[in-house]
């Protein structure tokens, strides 16, 4: 089982992924929790570079793809060993952030992601949707990925992806309480995989 969580910073996705990991572990599942960019030793170095350096949108995209390619090799291994892999961001982030936010184009970013991941698609993606104002209020400070207009384009990208892939992407209202969102996450996971309770 390969599950990803998506959303703009301040949406609550990192909280929800940790809650789901705890829930699954209590039910005897072996869980691996990873994040993007990062998730591997080299990926974490790339993450530091991405978060502190100004660069062109294309250079940024290629660094994300390099990090993702390394991580996918690990994810495939964990999946083959029967682990549940939970990932904080994946290909949908690149499409939303670089394709829409940085205006590189949805199609080219999707093709490059497909190549970098050997076409590995999550079984399920939770997109936690919040308006930009709410997300910025939760975060408090802005980094270069968080300018208001940019985040509006990113959010639009996520919503486009959710409409295109309703069988995979479940949209959750991120303005609700942590507990309410967690209940919906658990309900969807149980619906799809009939977990032993």
UniProtKB/Swiss-Prot annotation:
It is an enzyme of class 2 (transferase). It catalyses: dTMP + ATP = dTDP + ADP. One of its GO terms (cellular component) is cytosol. CDD domains: TMPK (cd01672). One of its GO terms (biological process) is dUDP biosynthetic process. ATP binds at residues 7-14. Keywords: ATP-binding, Kinase, Nucleotide biosynthesis, Nucleotide-binding, Transferase. It comes from the Bacteria. InterPro entries: P-loop_NTPase, Thymidylate_kin-like_dom, Thymidylate_kin_CS, Thymidylate_kinase. Its EC number is 2.7.4.9. One of its GO terms (molecular function) is ATP binding. PROSITE patterns: THYMIDYLATE_KINASE. Phosphorylation of dTMP to form dTDP in both de novo and salvage pathways of dTTP synthesis. Belongs to the thymidylate kinase family. This is Thymidylate kinase. It comes from Thermotoga petrophila (strain ATCC BAA-488 / DSM 13995 / JCM 10881 / RKU-1).
């Amino acid at each position: 089982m390969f599950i990803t969580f998506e959303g703009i910073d301040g949406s609550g996705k990192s909280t929800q992924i940790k809650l789901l990991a705890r829930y699954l572990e209590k039910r005897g599942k072996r869980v691996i929790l990873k994040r993007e960019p990062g998730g591997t030793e080299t990926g974490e170095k790339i993450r530091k570079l991405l978060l502190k350096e100004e660069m062109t949108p294309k250079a940024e995209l290629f660094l994300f793809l390099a990090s993702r390619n390394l991580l996918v090799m690990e994810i495939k291994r964990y999946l083959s060993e029967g682990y549940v892999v939970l990932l904080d961001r994946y290909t949908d982030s690149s499409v939303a952030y670089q394709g829409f936010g940085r205006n590189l184009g949805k199609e080219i970013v999707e093709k490059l992601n497909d190549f970098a991941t050997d076409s590995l698609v999550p079984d399920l993606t939770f997109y936690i949707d919040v308006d930009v104002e709410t997300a910025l209020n939760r975060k408090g400070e802005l980094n270069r990925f968080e300018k208001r207009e940019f985040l509006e384009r990113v959010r639009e990208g996520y919503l486009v992806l959710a409409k295109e892939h309703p069988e995979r992407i479940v949209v959750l209202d991120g303005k609700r309480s942590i507990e309410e969102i967690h209940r919906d996450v658990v309900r969807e996971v149980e619906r799809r995989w009939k977990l032993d309770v």
